[in-house]
Structure formats: C-alpha cells, structure tokens
C-alpha cells in the first residue's frame, strides 16, 4: 500500500509494466485504488481472487492483462457512494480454473466509465479466442461515457495484440525472468487450463524465494553513476556524463 505524508492527498501515480500476482489467501487481491489521477498501464494480474483492480476516484486503466481471478476482476467502485470516473481502454481478460465470471462488475450509476476495446476469453478451453466485451457484461449498471475523461496521453495498443507486445517483457524480464515470473507467464499461456490461488509462498512447486540462487547480469556502462546506462542516455537525449537522474524534466518526470 501507499500512504500519504500528511501534506495532501495521494495522486499522480503510475504503476506500469509490473506483474501483480499470487496474493495470499485469505485476502488475495490485486489492488484497491481510491485516489485521483492514478494510471495502471501495461500490467499483468495473475491468480488474484479479487480487485484486479478495484477502482474509485478518477483513474485510467489501459493495456492490462488479467488472468484467473475468482470472485472479482475489475471492480467498478464496489457499489460505493460518491462519483467515480475511469478510462478502461485496450485491456485483455482471460478466465482461468478459478472461474471468475464477467471481467467488469460491482458498479452502480455513480460509476462513469469510458470503455473501449476491452476483450475477454471466457471459455477456459486452452485456445486464445476472445470476444469484445459488450456493454451488457459491465455488471451493476455503470454510466457509460462517450468520450474519455481528461487523462494522461498514453500509447494504446489493441487489446488482442497484448500477448505479443506486452506479455514477453512485462515485469522484471531482464536479463531473464525468475522462477515465479516464468510460472505465472506459463499459466497465462495455458488459456484457462492452469492456475490457482495460494495461501503461502512455499506451496509453489519451486519453493520460496529464499531457496533460489541469485541470477546475475552484466552491469551496463554508466559513467556518471546516476543509474541510467550511457547507451540509454545517449539514445534519449540526456547527458551520460552528468549525474542528472533526480532532475525534474518539463513533463514532470
């Protein structure tokens, strides 16, 4: 969880390219987002019972993949009071052995959603054959917006391409994946045949992380020691000879 510093409300947070998987029972959840200006982008949710994610406030949910939920997937406010807004664009949902039902649920008319290009593979037959989710499967009766709310401008890929464009590199994939990440990626590629919820890390077939040997890569050249490799800085217009990692750019980063 992320807590505030007492100086104002949380906001302007992006969580991207992350694997959010295998929350432990009996509270196995992907995440509760109830602040404004939160972006969830190109993440992979696997083997979480619920909240993949649960959204309140004003937020955007773009190009995420969700696999094998049980009681809840994208929860639209949870029938809560207050007015909420979300852009949900280009997301892919694949049901697994836990069942899961519809990808979008928990709404009421106070939840306003701009929903475009969201697809679901519901039949758990081992074959990737999704369909575009119709408005009738956004359970609870949300209010559909005809245009997106103002949010951060993101490159958005078609949902049906995410297995090729996002899945191979999501998470800590360099120099190569650890056991846990390979395990959940393999579950996704089973298209409904593999997966489950766990209550302790040691129940996984490869043991707990403390049992693993460390995998090492080769450190990339970084002349100024600012954590950004020289090659990346040269390609992106920053100075590889100046320690400027903490400099705030004109775009706020």
Predicted segments, located by residue:
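Aromatic-acidic/polar surface patches that form glycan- and anion
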Residues: 8, 81, 221
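Short, flexible, glycine/charge-rich loop motifs used to bind or transfer phosphoryl groups or to couple energy/partner
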Residues: 8, 108, 217-218
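Right-handed parallel beta-helix
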Residues: 1-25, 29-51, 58-71, 84-97, ...
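Short acidic, glycine/proline-rich loop/turn micro-motifs
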Residues: 26, 75, 243-244
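Extracellular beta-rich repeat passengers
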Residues: 54-205
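Extracellular calcium-associated, cysteine-rich motifs in secreted modular proteins
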Residues: 204-253
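Non-transmembrane alpha-helical segments in soluble domains
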Residues: 41-42, 185, 229
């Amino acid at each position: 969880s992320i807590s505030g510093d007492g100086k104002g409300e949380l906001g302007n947070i992006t969580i991207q390219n992350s694997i959010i998987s295998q929350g432990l029972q009996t509270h196995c959840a992907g995440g509760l987002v109830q602040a404004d200006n939160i972006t969830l982008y190109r993440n992979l949710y696997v083997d979480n019972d619920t909240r993949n994610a649960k959204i309140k406030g004003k937020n955007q949910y773009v190009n995420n993949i969700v696999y094998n939920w049980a009681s809840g997937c994208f929860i639209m406010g949870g029938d809560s009071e207050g007015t909420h807004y979300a852009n949900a664009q280009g997301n892919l949902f694949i049901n697994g052995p836990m069942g899961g039902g519809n990808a979008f649920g928990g709404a009421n008319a106070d939840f306003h959603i701009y929903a475009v290009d969201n697809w679901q593979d519901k039949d758990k037959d081992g074959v990737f054959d999704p369909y575009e989710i119709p408005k009738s499967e956004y359970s609870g009766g949300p209010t559909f917006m005809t245009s997106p709310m103002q949010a951060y401008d993101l490159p958005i890929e078609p949902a049906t391409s995410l297995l090729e464009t996002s899945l191979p590199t999501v998470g800590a994939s360099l120099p190569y994946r650890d056991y846990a990440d390979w395990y959940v990626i393999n579950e996704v590629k089973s298209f409904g045949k593999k997966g489950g919820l766990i209550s302790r890390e040691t129940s996984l077939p490869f043991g707990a992380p403390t049992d693993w040997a460390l995998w090492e890569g080769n450190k990339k050249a970084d002349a100024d020691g600012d954590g950004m490799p020289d090659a990346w800085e040269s390609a992106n217009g920053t100075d590889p000879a100046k320690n400027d990692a903490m400099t705030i750019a004109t775009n706020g980063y």
